[in-house]
Amino acid sequence: MPRHARAFSDTTRRTSDTAAALGLSPTPDPALADLDLGGWTGRDLMDLPVGQVAAWIADPSATPHGGESVLDLLERVGGWLHRVAALPGRTVAITHPAVVRAVVVVALDANPESFWRIDVPPLTSTGLHAHGGRWALRHACLPL
């Protein structure tokens, strides 16, 4: 992790535990919460209606689960990126794979449909650099 970086995370135990293992004391930020899966939260993927899952993956605006759409997540994460780009120094976010996917899509100004084509394993680091209001991807999915 970058030295002397400010750290942010959501308030879940898994991000708190990861931050503690990294020696970080993050500031809670709801913008870094995982994608809200609504009625699908905690359910096994194989138990979900196949047609609804397929529609959800194909359409970033879909919310068959009653939670948050991928477009909603991209907007939320985009707002967070805009805020931290204005801060001096380095920032570390301890967050969830879906949020990291959203960060990459927003930073690269990629098509929202590319969200599901980004694989983010747990306990990895993705690095970006902001300059002049634009983001550049430095590295992705390096093991911690």
Identify the residue ranges that each predicted region occupies.
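Amphipathic, non-transmembrane alpha-helical scaffold segments
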Residues: 12, 70, 74-78, 117
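Short glycine/proline- and acidic residue-enriched helix-loop micro-motifs
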Residues: 52-72
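Phosphate-coordination/substrate-recognition cap region in phosphate-metabolizing enzymes
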Residues: 1-53
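Short beta-strand scaffold positions
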Residues: 9-10, 75, 94-95
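Generic beta-sheet signal
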Residues: 5, 87-98
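Generic structural signal for well-ordered alpha-helical scaffold segments
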Residues: 74, 78-85, 104
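Acidic, low-complexity terminal tails and accessory targeting/binding regions
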Residues: 35-46, 105-144
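A short, N-terminal amphipathic alpha-helix
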Residues: 1-5, 82-83, 130
